[in-house]
């Protein structure tokens, strides 16, 4: 994927005192605009309507419900998902097609929403800014943004968005997925069953899910941790939560009826 850059003025403005919510939202808007031009998004109105309804159902129960959340299905066969600061969540069609129930898709969305709620990418960017700001300045002033040196320094946005989160970040996002799905009235066990599927596929077809595990570290230990989060809730409080809906079934059938995803673009 072509790297995506945050405007220089935003980087300078955020360096001295951290990244505010307003700056995060503006960065996210810039980032998402470029991603939406570069990635093949599914344009089907019904598919987009459903993914946004389900995503909003979860995001509206979080501490950052005030963000203008947007959810997209990327028309790509590889299994992956990611989120951009400010409330932009992208799920690859290949991952959606591996879900069999609504609660599994909700678990995926809840996890990516969790990264935004906890500002994981923003925190990575804040750490990187101090080291990279000098190279960024040199790149802008000397117009050598395609050089290896510039690529190493200026690409704060692209590196942060597509970075491999730490195991701690992933565990926190998993805990958020459980918390937020429960708050939305959705069975949190989809978080676990989805991950079990991907781990099983990794053993039989590792290439099919390599992109997902490259950006989402951890395996069985995350299942144990997610189950521990679920166990914090009385069993009686989870008994009547939703696992599946007819709307999800229609959404999944529509996804699977689409023409094959386009081949990946040359890097």
State what each model feature region is.
Residues 2-6, 17-267:
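A Zn2+-metalloprotease active-site environment signal
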């Amino acid at each position: 994927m072509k790297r995506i850059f945050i405007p220089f003025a935003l980087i300078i403005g955020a360096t001295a005192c951290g990244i505010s919510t307003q700056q995060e939202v503006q960065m996210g808007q810039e980032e998402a605009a470029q991603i939406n031009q570069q990635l093949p998004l599914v344009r089907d109105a019904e598919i987009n309507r459903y993914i946004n309804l389900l995503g909003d159902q979860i995001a509206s129960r979080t501490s950052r419900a005030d963000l203008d959340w947007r959810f997209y299905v990327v028309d790509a066969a590889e299994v992956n998902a990611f989120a951009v600061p400010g409330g932009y969540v992208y799920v690859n069609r290949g991952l959606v097609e591996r879900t069999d129930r609504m609660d599994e898709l909700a678990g995926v969305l809840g996890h990516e929403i969790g990264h935004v709620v906890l500002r994981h990418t923003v925190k990575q960017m804040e750490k990187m800014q101090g080291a990279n700001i000098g190279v960024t300045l040199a790149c802008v002033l000397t117009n050598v943004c395609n050089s290896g040196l510039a690529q190493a320094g200026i690409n704060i946005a692209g590196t942060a968005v597509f970075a491999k989160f730490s195991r701690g970040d992933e565990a926190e996002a998993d805990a958020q997925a459980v918390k937020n799905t429960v708050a939305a009235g959705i069975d949190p066990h989809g978080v676990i069953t989805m991950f079990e599927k991907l781990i099983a596929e990794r053993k039989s077809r590792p290439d099919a899910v390599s992109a997902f595990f490259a950006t989402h570290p951890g395996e069985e230990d995350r299942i144990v941790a997610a189950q521990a989060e679920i166990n914090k809730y009385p069993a009686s409080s989870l008994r009547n939560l939703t696992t599946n809906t007819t709307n999800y079934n229609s959404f999944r059938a529509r996804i699977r009826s689409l023409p094959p995803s386009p081949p990946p673009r040359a890097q």
